[in-house]
Regions:
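Helix-centered, glycine/charged polyanion-binding patches within enzymatic domains
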Residues: 99-100, 105-171
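Polybasic low-complexity intrinsically disordered regions
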Residues: 1-119, 128
Length: 171
């Protein structure tokens, strides 16, 4: 039972594999590192390939917003090959002004920080280092501080995968 409004929103994404057969065709990777979605040996035509931990997976990406206690408030499902930074705004709909939004480095972009500022939300997005521009010591400390709050969304994913067999989509 949830009684009061949340003062924080924690956002992250997880991969949901489809119940498809193993890869039968070569996977093509473009110059940006995106996996081509054209090779889909599954009945599920909306699922796409992505690479995680060195393994290719066919499926979807679930973007999730939880409150500071880990209760899931909003979901947004996309094909697995989409990048996280493009899918922050649908998760922020209906959030109260002044709420702190915590998110991992995948959501770090100028557009997302601007969106938070326009909607009067507090920025808790971890900073990402770019080529030839490593993080400063202050940014590294900030990321370490923010990661201590973000664990609740990882616990929610763990519960979904472990208790409810959320690892594979079936239809």
């Amino acid at each position: 039972l949830k009684v009061e409004k949340a003062s924080a929103a924690v956002i992250d994404a997880t991969i949901i594999q489809t119940a498809g057969s193993k890869q039968r065709q070569a996977i093509e990777v473009d110059e940006e590192g995106q996996v081509s979605g054209q090779t889909t040996p599954s009945k599920d035509s909306d699922a796409r390939w992505t690479k995680k931990n060195g393994l290719y997976r066919l499926g979807y990406k679930q973007h999730t917003r939880t409150d500071e206690e880990g209760y899931i408030e909003k979901l947004h499902i996309t094909p697995a090959n989409t990048h996280e930074c493009n899918h922050l705004s649908p998760l922020l709909e209906g959030i109260a002004e002044g709420t702190t939004v915590y998110a991992d480095k995948g959501y770090d972009s100028t557009e997302n920080r601007q969106h938070l500022k326009e909607h009067r939300l507090l920025d808790g997005i971890m900073r990402k280092a770019h080529r030839n521009r490593p993080l400063t010591e202050a940014q590294t400390k900030r990321n370490r501080y923010l990661s201590k709050t973000r664990y609740v969304v990882e616990q929610s994913f763990g519960t979904l995968h472990r208790k409810f067999r959320y690892a594979r989509a079936a239809y």
